[in-house]
Structures are given as C-alpha cells and as structure tokens.
C-alpha cells in the first residue's frame, strides 16, 4: 500500500497537493492532553486518503506560541481547503475547543463541512442543534465514520 497523505501542520508552508481537508477541533493546551489528530491521520492512511491534511497544531507540543500568527495560518488554511472536518472531543479542562466553536459557526454556511463528536463530549448540544438545523444531517459520533465520509466526499 502506498500512502498518499500529505500532512501540513500549523505555521508550515501550505503546499497543498490534491484534495485537502482541515482537521478542526480542540488542540491540546497542556502537554498531558493527547491530540486526537494523530488517530485521525492513522485512519486516513488506513483508508488510503490521497490528498493533503491541514492540521492546526504544531508537530511537537509548544506550551507558549505566537497565537495571532497561528490564527492567521488557520484562517488561510480554512479558506484554502476543500472540506473542513470538525471533530469536537471536548473535555474540560484541557480540550475545550473554544476557537473551534467560532470557526464552526463562521464556516457552517460558507464551506463544505462535516461535524462529529464522541457521545461523551462536554457541552456540544448547541453545535449538534446548529449542524442539524443548517445541514439536515445528524452529527457523527465516531471519528472513523466521520473520516470515511470525508474521503468519500473528496473523491
């Protein structure tokens, strides 16, 4: 099997190859929190996604960074991608996803998006309601199913 997933992390040059998706959702704010994005990349590789994955976090955890520069990178990546995939495994206090809430509301009617969250995620009722209201779809509750649908859409 040849893996054709190109990963571009925050602040890296955006050399997008093929179809692209942006992994939107909480990022670790503490080195003890585990990022869900590694699992997402593994799933995309398992299903042989051929394209670029834009990941709005550093390859290696950095406690302090230039937030506004990263936000600028995020906005460029969000506007450049073919699909925004929101996965909101919100868990207090380390995986809040507050910026993700704003991005979700901003892009829900502007770009192609998919949305999901685990059934035990904290405080996601409003996102669920808005997604159902604006798309007519039910949120995914399984990361693998969400990403398989992403691949299908981008083919």
Language model segments and positions:
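Conserved catalytic or regulatory cores that recognize and/or transform ribose-phosphate-containing ligands
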Residues: 1-155
């Amino acid at each position: 099997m040849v893996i054709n997933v190109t990963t571009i992390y925050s602040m890296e040059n955006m050399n997008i190859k093929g179809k692209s998706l942006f992994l939107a959702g909480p990022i670790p704010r503490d080195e003890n929190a585990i990022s869900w994005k590694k699992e997402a990349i593994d799933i995309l590789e398992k299903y042989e996604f051929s394209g670029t994955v834009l990941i709005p976090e550093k390859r290696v955890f950095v406690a302090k960074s230039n937030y506004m520069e990263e936000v600028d990178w995020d906005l460029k990546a969000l506007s450049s991608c073919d699909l925004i995939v929101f996965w909101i495994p919100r868990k207090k206090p380390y995986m809040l996803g507050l910026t993700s809430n704003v991005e979700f509301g901003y892009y829900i009617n502007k770009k192609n998006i998919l949305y999901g969250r685990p059934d035990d995620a904290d405080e996601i009722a409003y996102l669920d309601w808005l997604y159902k209201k604006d798309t007519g779809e039910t949120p995914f509750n399984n990361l693998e199913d969400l990403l398989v649908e992403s691949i299908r859409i981008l083919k």
